[in-house]
Amino acid sequence: MPGLLLGDEAPNFEADTTQGGIRFHDFLGDSWGILFSHPRDFTPVCTTELGRAAKLAPEFSKRNVKMIALSIDSVPDHLAWSKDINAYNGDQPVEKLPFPIIADKDRELAVKLGMLDPDERDKDGMPLTARVVFIFGPDKKLKLSILYPATTGRNFDEILRVVDSLQLTAYKKVATPVDWKCGDSVMVVPTLPDEEAKKLFPKGVFTKDLPSGKKYLRYTPQPE
């Protein structure tokens, strides 16, 4: 099945959305971007997901991240459903979210991007879109891909955490360890020699002693 692999450039597709027609590369501009699909409008898990995405939209915006959703529903359905999403969030039930939703009624994009879930089908037996998350860098290349089944809602706080890690590690020679969150210490990448690490990280590099005697667990406070 067609799809995207890490490092692939995003296709410069055209699409109809709740905010008008777009060309994807123009939409992204020089920003980071998150493209996320959901199975259907007017369904319970999807409503909670897009509600949380809407609540976190200001945080993504602070990080220069543009968000755009996608499903096989029509633009009128997306707009009507937006009222329910806003009401779920306790906001005014208006036909507007802080990000556009793509109407991929013929499944053309879902097929091209590998977003279909073979186990979830509509009343006509056609596959629905899965819960996919693609994160693109300013170079339009895929930096992260996550695929969830229809039964499991996504954690958008985790997606925000991943963005923090991707942006930090894109510009600094560090990696983020398990359960890392912004402000925690990070790991110095193994390919960086000790002397260069000391120059790059003036706050200090701390190496954990290990039974193997190898010096690969090197920590440093998160660089600015």
From Swiss-Prot:
* Entry-linked InterPro entries: AhpC/TSA (IPR000866), Peroxiredoxin_AhpC-typ (IPR024706), Peroxiredoxin_C (IPR019479), PRX_1cys (IPR045020), Thioredoxin-like_sf (IPR036249), Thioredoxin_domain (IPR013766)
Q: Which residues carry this modification: Phosphothreonine?
A: T176
Modified residue annotations for Phosphotyrosine: Y88
What residues sit in the active site?
C46 (cysteine sulfenic acid (-soh) intermediate), D139 (for phospholipase activity)
Gene3D superfamilies in the record? Antioxidant, Horf6, Chain A, domain2, Glutaredoxin
Q: Where is this region: Required and sufficient for targeting to lysosomes and lamellar bodies?
A: 30-39
CDD domains for this protein: PRX_1cys
User: Which stretch is the leader sequence?
Assistant: none
Looking at the record, the residues that make up the Thioredoxin domain are 4-168
Catalyzed chemical reaction(s): a hydroperoxide + 2 glutathione = an alcohol + glutathione disulfide + H2O; a 1,2-diacyl-sn-glycero-3-phosphocholine + H2O = a 1-acyl-sn-glycero-3-phosphocholine + a fatty acid + H(+); a 1-acyl-sn-glycero-3-phosphocholine + an acyl-CoA = a 1,2-diacyl-sn-glycero-3-phosphocholine + CoA; 1-hexadecanoyl-sn-glycero-3-phosphocholine + hexadecanoyl-CoA = 1,2-dihexadecanoyl-sn-glycero-3-phosphocholine + CoA
* PROSITE patterns per the UniProt record, alphabetical: THIOREDOXIN_2 (PS51352)
What does the record say about PTM?
Irreversibly inactivated by overoxidation of Cys-46 to sulfinic acid (Cys-SO(2)H) and sulfonic acid (Cys-SO(3)H) forms upon oxidative stress.
Localization (cell): Cytoplasm; Lysosome
| Single GO term (MF) | peroxidase activity
Cellular component terms, GO, for this chain's entry? cytosol; extracellular space; lysosome
Which PANTHER family does the entry mention?
MCG48959-RELATED, PEROXIREDOXIN-6
What is the purpose of this protein? Thiol-specific peroxidase that catalyzes the reduction of hydrogen peroxide and organic hydroperoxides to water and alcohols, respectively. Can reduce H(2)O(2) and short chain organic, fatty acid, and phospholipid hydroperoxides. Also has phospholipase activity, and can therefore either reduce the oxidized sn-2 fatty acyl group of phospholipids (peroxidase activity) or hydrolyze the sn-2 ester bond of phospholipids (phospholipase activity). These activities are dependent on binding to phospholipids at acidic pH and to oxidized phospholipds at cytosolic pH.
Quaternary structure and interacting proteins, as annotated: Homodimer. Interacts with GSTP1; mediates PRDX6 glutathionylation and regeneration.
What family is this protein classified in? Belongs to the peroxiredoxin family. Prx6 subfamily.
| Misc. comment | The active site is a conserved redox-active cysteine residue, the peroxidatic cysteine (C(P)), which makes the nucleophilic attack on the peroxide substrate. The peroxide oxidizes the C(P)-SH to cysteine sulfenic acid (C(P)-SOH), which then reacts with another cysteine residue, the resolving cysteine (C(R)), to form a disulfide bridge. The disulfide is subsequently reduced by an appropriate electron donor to complete the catalytic cycle. In this 1-Cys peroxiredoxin, no C(R) is present and C(P) instead forms a disulfide with a cysteine from another protein or with a small thiol molecule.
The name under which this protein is listed is: Peroxiredoxin-6
Which organism does this record belong to? Answer: Gallus gallus
The top of its lineage is: Eukaryota, Metazoa, Chordata, Craniata, Vertebrata
